[in-house]
Regions:
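Extended, hydrophobic alpha-helical segments in both membrane/secreted and soluble proteins
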Residues: 6-7, 333
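Adenosine-phosphate binding glycine-rich loop
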Residues: 23-71, 308
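C-terminal catalytic/substrate-binding lobe primarily of soluble NAD(P)-dependent oxidoreductases
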Residues: 55-351
Length: 351
């Protein structure tokens, strides 16, 4: 702002950033945020549909906006069915959030302990039946997207089946806590047993009894494979179970050089047209990495790079603090992204 230079990030707008809106306008600059894939491409493709529906006199009744950065199906062979294509600790950290969304006119608040219980099941053609857990807070998007008429507003994260069961059990066993522990001279099994009041020598059986699960429970298979039940010495003297769990995941769950990542996105709208007819609009994207770039790198960086060029070319002339929800911003960005093979496929069904 002091140097009157435009700025762009792919990060969420912080409250501190929002407060700079007037100062940025006075300086005649734009501070563009949330212009990656999620957030970013999700905003732009959602607003493209919302604006079209509103322009035609319709209204948005329900909106589910779902996205996942995953490994491609052929690489999803470990018991978590997940490999990291971006910040590993960030992925695990997201699992410690509470969640809030609107469902049939009612605000649903989910404590972090319930985050991975009862995931939505959503079919994604070309992939498989996916599980979805809710993002931190979907409610601000009702105002941001201008859909005050909506009865359901849900933003969520796609995962293959197994992930939610595994994370739910890890959390129940206090294995994603940020609290620092004395780890000197202890094994993974001893620590897991001690913080849960279980017997380290009979740990797996104790867990099955405590949580009423059997040998074939997807979560139990996953955490056993990860190593948190092993009588193996912990290599740290101090640290949190979050650190230990995420370190084990980094060791075992990174993408191999010959494996592809994948980003999938799906918007599901239920709308009412001006004539009273109801329709379901489903908009989908599936994007794979290749030998040159990961999908997550392409889908985060291209919207940002295109937006930078449009600002420099004066095709975007807004000032102040923004996210890409105005047509004057998203329209040209989406058109340019199509030239790079990033686009949504849209289908409409009458209800």
């Amino acid at each position: 702002i002091a140097h009157k230079k435009n700025m762009l990030t792919t990060s969420y707008v912080s409250p501190e950033m929002s407060k700079l809106d007037e100062k940025a306008k006075e300086a005649g600059i734009i501070i563009m945020n949330e212009i990656g894939v999620d957030p970013g491409y999700d905003h732009m493709t959602a607003m493209d549909i919302i604006d079209r529906v509103h322009e035609e006199g319709g209204k948005i009744d329900n909106f589910h906006s779902l996205c996942g950065a995953l490994c491609a199906p052929e690489a999803s062979y470990n018991p978590f069915r997940y490999k990291f294509s971006w910040s590993p600790k960030g992925v695990v950290m997201a699992g410690n959030n509470d969640a809030q969304y609107l469902e049939n006119g009612k605000v649903i608040n989910l404590d972090t302990t319930l985050l991975f219980k009862n995931p939505l099941e959503i079919n994604f053609p070309g992939v498989e039946l996916m599980h979805v857990y809710p993002n931190r807070d979907s409610l601000p998007y009702i105002d941001l997207y201008g859909i005050k008429e909506a009865k359901t507003m849900y933003r969520g994260t796609f995962r293959y089946p197994n992930w939610c069961a595994a994370l739910d059990l890890l959390k129940a066993l206090k294995l994603t806590s940020y609290e620092e522990q004395d780890l000197k001279g202890r094994t993974y099994a001893q620590l897991t047993a001690e913080i849960n009041g279980l017997d380290a020598n009979n740990l797996k059986e104790d867990i099955k009894t405590k949580y009423t699960i059997d040998e074939n429970h997807a979560g139990l298979k996953a955490i056993e494979w990860l190593g948190v039940l092993d009588p193996k010495p912990i290599p740290l003297e101090k640290g949190s179970t979050f650190d230990l769990t995420s370190d084990l995941m980094i060791e075992k769950m990174m993408m191999e050089d010959d494996e592809r990542d994948m980003v999938i996105m799906q918007h599901i709208f239920i709308i009412t047209r001006a004539n009273g007819n109801r329709e379901k609009i489903v908009s989908r994207m599936i994007d794979y990495g290749d030998k040159h770039y990961t999908s997550i790198a392409r889908t985060v960086s291209l919207p940002a790079a295109i937006c930078v060029k449009l600002i420099l070319d004066k095709a975007i002339t807004e000032t102040g603090v923004h996210i890409p929800i105005k047509k004057s911003i998203y329209f040209n960005v989406l058109n340019e992204l199509k030239k790079h093979g990033i686009s949504m496929e849209e289908t409409t069904t009458k209800l």
